[in-house]
From Swiss-Prot:
The lineage of its organism: Bacteria, Bacillati, Bacillota, Bacilli, Bacillales. One of its GO terms (cellular component) is cytoplasm. One of its GO terms (biological process) is UMP salvage. Its main location: cytoplasm. This is Uridine kinase.
Length: 212
């Protein structure tokens, strides 16, 4: 493990943009190396104090839904090579689970989430900021597939949420945050040229750390 500060790579983009695919492609290339993924999705605010009817009204695409204070605290601890206990969010109960996931510090941290570029405090902690930019029609199709398959949602509920919440929030918060990115990746996980470029960049960073 290097003695200097870990490198933080931020990967942002709208829901269904392919940012998770980009993250996984980069991470899989470096399996066995000193690299970790920290997902903003795990840092939704605890809502255990609220009744279920209130939790169901949560707008998960709004910046205020995230506990960025805790995310920043954990990121700062990882930057100091300290272990953190990552929270787990229960989407069926719409609140934070009692489960935690211990995360060991690594030399390269991939921070992934829809709104990580929206918070200037998070941007300040990133060395490289990426925005995965994908056509809106493709994003909604991917979101429908995910929510129906993985979260037990109906097609009607997914479409209603997209029209009334996801699309407005994307236009208001996520799309404007694109201007803070150092690199914009069109077509998400299908953009092998961009992914290969990032792999080369990270490989250089890891090699420099080994030679310290």
């Amino acid at each position: 493990m290097g003695t200097n500060k870990p490198v933080v790579i931020g990967i942002a983009g709208g829901s269904g943009s392919g940012k998770t695919s980009v993250t996984k492609a980069i991470f899989d290339h470096f399996k066995g190396h000193s690299i970790l993924i920290l997902e903003q999705d795990y840092y939704y605010k605890d809502q255990s104090h609220l009744p279920m009817e209130e939790r169901l009204k949560t707008n998960y695409d709004h910046p205020l839904a995230f506990d960025n204070d805790l995310l920043i605290e954990h990121l700062q601890q990882l930057l100091a090579y300290k272990q953190v206990d990552k929270p787990v969010y229960d989407y069926t109960l719409h609140t934070r689970s009692e489960e935690i996931i211990p995360v060991e510090p690594k030399d390269v941290i991939i921070l992934e989430g829809i709104l990580i570029l929206e918070d200037p405090r998070l941007c300040e902690l990133m060395d490289i900021k990426l925005f995965v930019d994908t056509d809106a029609d493709l994003r909604i199709l991917r979101r429908m597939q995910r929510d129906i398959k993985e979260r037990g949602r109906t097609m009607d509920s997914v479409i209603d949420q997209y029209v009334n919440v996801v699309r407005p929030m994307h236009n208001q918060f996520i799309e404007p945050s694109k201007k803070f990115a150092d690199i914009i990746i069109p077509e998400g996980g299908q953009n092998h040229v961009a992914i290969d470029s990032m792999v080369t960049k990270i490989a250089t960073i890891l090699e420099q750390k080994v030679n310290l």
